[in-house]
Amino acid sequence: MGMSLESMAIEMPKVFGHPNRVGFRGVLTVVDAASDKAPAGARGHRVLLTRAAAEEAIPSLLGMALDYSPRLDGHDTRRKIGVITRAEIVGREVTVAGFLYGRDFPEMVAEIGKNPTHSQRARMNGVSGNPKHAGEGIPAAEAGLGMSYEIADAVVEDIKANVWILNQLTFTGAAVLRRNKAAYKSTWIELG
């Protein structure tokens, strides 16, 4: 099985120790797989982002904002905490990276910093049984923070279908939210 990689980035000048530029990276979504639940705006339908649509839309992610809602349970496009400077498709994952406004939003940097890293999550999920995240009663795969994309100009193959297949879209941003609130539970975000 071969790995496919499509990548784009905005080259940011290196500024050592910049107080308002804290790096982040993570998985925004997956391609060619139905969402675990219906995202906001999909009228109760699960969605499937096709690889072709994602490849075409990757450039629209660059320079878009990363936002959050105070309860980390949805989107709030007026609370912009960072910017996406890199987006790529690795296998079936749409990965992103960029910068958080660390000086402006130290509480969000701290919250994301508490999130288990990708390798820690893999170890938690590798334990036999159904591991729980510390005291929350949530399976480790759903614990912590994830991400969700924001889009416009979506073309849905069949709006009567149970799963909406997205064949075209424009990314307009992304949100940080609790993984158990995300449409795709395999999303994640970490500092780095």
Language-model segments: which ranges?
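Polar/acidic, low-complexity leader/linker segments enriched in S/T/G and N/D
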Residues: 1-62
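A structural detector for beta-sheet-dominated domains
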Residues: 6, 13, 31, 62, ...
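Short amphipathic beta-strand and strand-loop transition segments with alternating hydrophobic
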Residues: 7-17, 78-89, 155
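A broad, low-specificity signal marking well-ordered, structured residues that form hydrophobic/aromatic
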Residues: 22-26, 64-66, 94, 147, ...
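Short, surface-exposed beta-strand/loop "edge" segments at domain boundaries and coil↔beta transitions
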Residues: 23, 29-40, 56, 72-76, ...
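Short conserved beta-strand and strand-loop elements enriched in small hydrophobics
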Residues: 60-75, 147
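Short secondary-structure capping micro-motifs at structural edges
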Residues: 69-72, 79-85, 134-136
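Residue microenvironments linked to proteolytic maturation
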Residues: 86-192
